UniProtKB/Swiss-Prot annotation:
Keywords: Heme, Iron, Metal-binding, Oxygen transport, Transport. Binds oxygen cooperatively with very high affinity (P(50) = 0.013 mmHg at 20 degrees Celsius) because of a fast combination (25 microM(-1)sec(-1)) and a slow dissociation (0.2 sec(-1)) rate. It comes from Mycobacterium tuberculosis (strain ATCC 25618 / H37Rv). Belongs to the truncated hemoglobin family. Group I subfamily. One of its GO terms (cellular component) is cytoplasm. GO terms for biological process: cell redox homeostasis; cellular response to oxidative stress; detoxification of nitrogen compound; nitric oxide catabolic process. This is Group 1 truncated hemoglobin GlbN.
Amino acid sequence: MGLLSRLRKREPISIYDKIGGHEAIEVVVEDFYVRVLADDQLSAFFSGTNMSRLKGKQVEFFAAALGGPEPYTGAPMKQVHQGRGITMHHFSLVAGHLADALTAAGVPSETITEILGVIAPLAVDVTSGESTTAPV
């Protein structure tokens, strides 16, 4: 196979690589949780949570979801979130904090839109509509 043929068949760059890989995701996840935990409508969901472990799993999840080399090894989203009273309103708030953290990290708006498009289908597994406010 000639050089031109190989160049034409290059794999498209993953979102994971576009945003800077594992290190960039770690920075975004750290900022993301600062924002989420500062949100009075969301912070109570994380009461008693081992945040260090959660951040590690979140980095792993985002890396896998965005085309990184390693698979996500955590529990299924539905299992982790069921019965917690997370509504679409909460999901939208979380998505907004993610977009803000990505923007702060210098991720271009079109890439942020791609990322939110990857995350949006998870709403079905994460939300239950059982409550309109976080537990107190």
